[in-house]
Curated annotation (Swiss-Prot):
Residues involved in UDP-alpha-D-glucuronate binding: 393, 398, 432-433, 460, 492, 526-535, 613
Function recorded in the entry: Bifunctional enzyme that catalyzes the oxidative decarboxylation of UDP-glucuronic acid (UDP-GlcUA) to UDP-4-keto-arabinose (UDP-Ara4O) and the addition of a formyl group to UDP-4-amino-4-deoxy-L-arabinose (UDP-L-Ara4N) to form UDP-L-4-formamido-arabinose (UDP-L-Ara4FN). The modified arabinose is attached to lipid A and is required for resistance to polymyxin and cationic antimicrobial peptides.
Native source organism of the sequence: Escherichia coli (strain SMS-3-5 / SECEC)
Entry protein name: Bifunctional polymyxin resistance protein ArnA
UniProt KW Magnesium keyword: no
Length: 660
């Protein structure tokens, strides 16, 4: 039976050996070049392939059409993947009549994704395993063919668990590969309700946060012990690594991070204390805890910290362009609530941020991004994080002023992106749910959903494609020039200060503001094309909390990611939104100041938005990236958001001339 193999690491080597022992004919092996920054303690797939006389390749992009064609010419009967690090395109998987199978180091459906070996230890699991499953378009989601369980001992560390997994994988493959060859396998679908997914880990993820419990920190040490990079902390500006540790449940009470004793080296935690059994100062040698304490100059009462002291002293400088806008002013409020941010802002007005103007860590300049280019370039260079939030984002403007939308949303933002590349600054860019366009997926997925827009003669799409092209430019700068970036896609955020009723009067506002204006003025609520279009409405507080976590970027998990920020549970049609808003309006204590409700009126989109408009029937986000990268879930119910948004706008109305 002919096979093509994708393999890396020890698991790749043992998988190849198992295939050969089972009588498979391996036509080619695809692997990776070794990362010079990674400690190579594992077997070489390339060397094994060469010794066995099997053609071996390590392309940068195995999914490139040229490689897909070359694999097709090999005519594999079956495909196997053993710890290959890149997602293999469905076009390749479909080349094998018997299908494609992947070996994964966890008990699927739990711990899908990357580094399951390390994650199970981080999370203190007592059991894991290996799974052979059929490969499908979604990573690690195919039917299970075989599975072996492994107990995790309390003294297991990453390398001992790795050896256990390798031993189990050999057993599993020895039992299962002949059955696959004979076409005699039983497949069990994975239970999606039990699925969990984890992202890649980097050395920076393993800092010890002393406010956590000693048990949690001990698990971190176990998860990344040698030959992995190790858990670390700081004494002042000096970094040190903890290679092994021990939990002390009953220890004297002390401030987390304080040295309780130096022999043994015992550090107070949020709960209990952690004994550093062995460790290493900087680039030195490994030594026992008491010697490490002496080397680091620690005494009883000394304090450790999770980051260098110099980093802790300086506030992170955040540049927000469009700081007076809906997202900008709420984000400013969230950042200033903490004591480690300095916010620099630019906008053409200041009504929404007037409450911050006297704050010592808020610096505002009134100006236009198309004019104040020198100020912007200087502050991009000066700041650590850049959020270019300036955009025309109201649908009526897409058809009314398409060229202005392009000039502001694309051209001006491209200049800012290039400044970030020039000065090597981190950019957090507001993409949009609009980029998905008329995608037919049930859930819009950042990494897999197609971005589908209408024809050129529908100018309504100029906003969507401007944003999409900027997304692609940023991604390319990240790949080719090392730009540190995160793209976030808001899904219908709403709340107080969304826009204003004056904007609604000229049709240049979001849907809920327009509906509130209709109620305030006693005019009919217009339902465009019947108002059956569905959206997932997200409370601004939920959205801002997610955006704040992107800025925090714990363990650099947000770098290079695209993250939907929306609430898939708050799905409603525009008609349903209007009905919920009306019910809230009728119960409001200021209701008697306003005219009677004038009813709903169905209007055609062309008469409201003008020629060249197309609508989208549904827009529901997948939030798996937000869960994985941010540990975030939306919490606020749509009705609460509607009530608070309505109350805010009603209290902005001048009631002096209204009858009481």
């Amino acid at each position: 039976m002919k096979t093509v193999v994708f393999a890396y690491h020890d698991m790749g080597c043992l998988g190849i050996e198992a295939l050969l022992a089972a009588g498979y004919e391996i036509s080619a092996i695809f692997t990776h070049t070794d990362n010079p920054g990674e400690k190579a303690f594992y077997g070489s797939v390339a060397r094994l392939a060469a010794e066995r006389g099997i053609p071996v390749y390590a392309p940068d992009d195995v999914n490139h059409p040229l490689w897909v064609e070359r694999i097709a010419q090999l005519s594999p009967d079956v495909i196997f993947s053993f710890y290959y690090r890149h997602l293999i395109h469905d076009k390749i998987l479909q080349l094998a009549p018997a299908g494609a199978f992947n070996l994964h180091g966890s008990l699927l459906p739990k711990y899908r994704g990357r580094a399951p070996l390390n994650w199970v230890l981080v999370n203190g699991e007592t059991e894991t395993g290996v799974t052979l499953h059929r490969m499908v378009k979604r990573a690690d989601a195919g039917a299970i063919v075989a599975q072996l369980r492994i107990a995790i001992a309390p003294d297991d560390i990453a390398i001992t668990l790795h050896h256990k997994l390798c031993h189990a994988a050999r057993q599993l493959l020895e039992q299962t590969l002949p059955a696959i060859k004979d076409g005699n396998i039983l497949e069990i679908a994975q239970c999606e309700n039990e699925a969990t997914c984890f992202g890649r880990r980097t050395p920076e993820d393993s800092f010890l946060e002393w406010h956590k419990s000693a048990a949690v920190l001990h698990n971190m040490v176990r998860a990344v012990a040698d030959p992995w990079p190790g858990a670390f902390s700081y004494v002042g500006n000096q970094k040190f690594t903890v290679w092994s540790s021990r939990v002390h449940s009953h220890a004297p009470a002390a401030q987390p991070g304080s040295v309780i004793s130096v022999a043994p080296l015992l550090i107070a935690c949020g709960d209990g204390a952690l004994e550093i059994v062995t460790g290493q100062a900087g680039g030195g040698i490994t030594m026992q805890g008491s010697q490490l304490a002496q080397t680091l100059g620690l005494v009883q009462g000394s304090r450790l910290n999770s980051q260098p002291a110099c980093a802790a002293r300086r506030r992170t400088r955040v540049l927000i362009l469009g700081v007076n806008g809906f997202i900008g002013n709420h984000l400013t409020e969230r950042l200033l609530r903490e004591d480690h941010y300095e916010v620099y802002g630019l906008d053409i007005g200041s009504d929404a941020i007037s409450r911050f103007l006297n704050h010592p860590h808020f610096h505002f300049v009134e100006g236009d991004i198309s004019i104040h280019s020198e100020w912007i370039e200087y502050h991009v260079k000066k700041c650590d994080v850049v959020l270019p939030l300036v955009a025309i984002a109201t649908p009526i403007e897409y058809t009314r002023n398409p060229l202005r939308v392009f000039e502001l949303d694309f051209e001006e933002n491209l200049r800012i992106i290039r400044y970030c590349v020039k000065y090597r600054k981190r950019i957090i860019f507001p993409s949009t749910s609009e980029v998905y366009g008329m995608c037919s997926d049930k859930y819009f997925d950042e990494d897999h959903s197609n971005l589908i827009v209408g024809p050129v003669n529908k100018p309504r799409w100029i906003y969507s494609v401007s944003k999409q092209l900027l997304d692609r430019v940023i991604w390319a700068y990240g790949e080719k020039e090392g730009l540190q970036f995160t793209l976030f896609r808001p899904f219908n955020w709403m709340g107080p200060r969304l826009d204003n009723l004056n904007a609604a009067r000229i049709g240049s506002s979001r849907a809920i503001t327009q509906l509130i204006l209709n109620l305030v003025e006693g005019s009919p609520i217009k339902l465009i094309d019947g108002g059956k279009q569905k959206r997932c409405f997200t409370d601004i507080r939920d959205g801002i909390e997610a955006l704040y976590r992107i800025i925090e970027n714990a363990g650099n998990r947000c770098d290079g990611e695209i993250i939907n920020i929306g609430n898939p549970e708050n799905e409603a049609s525009i008609e349903e939104l209007g009905e919920m808003l009306l019910a809230s309006f009728e119960k409001h204590p200021l209701r008697h100041y306003f005219p009677p409700f004038a009813g709903f009126r169905v209007v055609e989109s062309s008469s409201y938005y003008g020629k060249g408009y197309q609508d989208v029937e549904h827009r529901k986000p997948s939030i798996r990236n937000a869960r994985r990268c941010l540990d975030w879930e939306p919490k606020i119910d749509m009705q609460e958001t509607i009530d608070e948004t309505l109350d805010f706008f009603l209290r902005t109305v001048d009631l002096t001339d209204k009858p009481s």
